[in-house]
Amino acid sequence: MWAQQPRFAEGLGPFSQVAQGAGYVGIEVSHLTDLGGFESLLNQSVLPVHSLHAPTPRPAAAARGLNLAATDEDERAAAVGSTVRTMDYAVRVGARFVVVHLGHISERLDEEDQLRRFFQQGRIESDEARATRDQAHRRRRELVGPHLTAAQRSLAELAEAASARGVAIGLENRLGFREIPSPEETALLLADYPPGLVGYWHDTGHLEVQGRLGLLDRQEALDSLGARILGTHLHDVQGLRDHRAPGNGESDWAYIARALPPAAVRTFEISGDEPETFIQGAIGFLARCGIL
């Protein structure tokens, strides 16, 4: 994400040089990267590409936002095809991992928006907030069934494609409550696949925000999936604003450090509006926290 800023618009080679100078040793290609930016990465030899975030390169407008959990079969199949395309690019650049958003419930859960307002008002522990959380969980349970079935089908097809290409799928936990999979759904999905083929990609900021809204227990969720973690997206949170540089927020990193397997890929997913000094300091900060 930090690569998506005007000074790197002409190519990501200069981004690679800045990243290397700050102490980073590899790159994840964001789903915001267009074909031109992707091709420029192929022409740099500064840092290896460890992972691709599907769909990469960024598809045409009509294909953006395709839902792997769609109940419409045409959309679901198109989303699978777009993700397999990313796997082909992963093979091309020698990346081992493809990070996947497995889709979402089509209906919005307005209760989550209300919880965000409660948080901003300092009322997240109020009776009204608790009632809103209960309603959010009830509505999600009522709506998720057909979408989870579609997501399972998509994952089966993607796992077959990944196995044929020698890459691994990392299922990312998402920011929105309507997104699939939840921690419980992730455990259910992963049970069908070997750890080296499909695993969990832990996004620290997304879990932190969900925890601050009271929608889940952060430590319980992470501990339940720790053994299946293939990689991470590391970023901090200010209030409910995620993708801050580690150290530029209020996240508790201690429980994360205890749960992360040593072999899990550590990827920094930092917003392009964070100052370069924070990018330079993030590695040292997380090393002191025991993450690196």
Question: PLM features: residue spans?
Answer:
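Hydrophobic faces of well-ordered beta-strands that scaffold small-molecule active sites
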Residues: 1, 27-29, 49-54, 98-100, ...
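N-terminal pre-domain/capping segments
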Residues: 1-85, 91-95, 120-126, 199, ...
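Histidine-acidic metal/acid-base catalytic patches
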Residues: 5-20, 35, 85-96, 109-110, ...
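Flexible loop residues that form catalytic
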Residues: 32, 55, 103, 237, ...
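Alpha-helix-loop-beta-strand connector modules within alpha/beta enzyme cores
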Residues: 46-58, 152-158, 162, 192-193, ...
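Active-site loop signature of alpha/beta-hydrolase-fold enzymes
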Residues: 57, 176, 207
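Short, basic/glycine-rich phosphate-binding loops at helix/coil junctions
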Residues: 63-64, 130-135, 232-236
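Active-site acidic/histidine proton-transfer and metal-coordination neighborhood
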Residues: 69-199
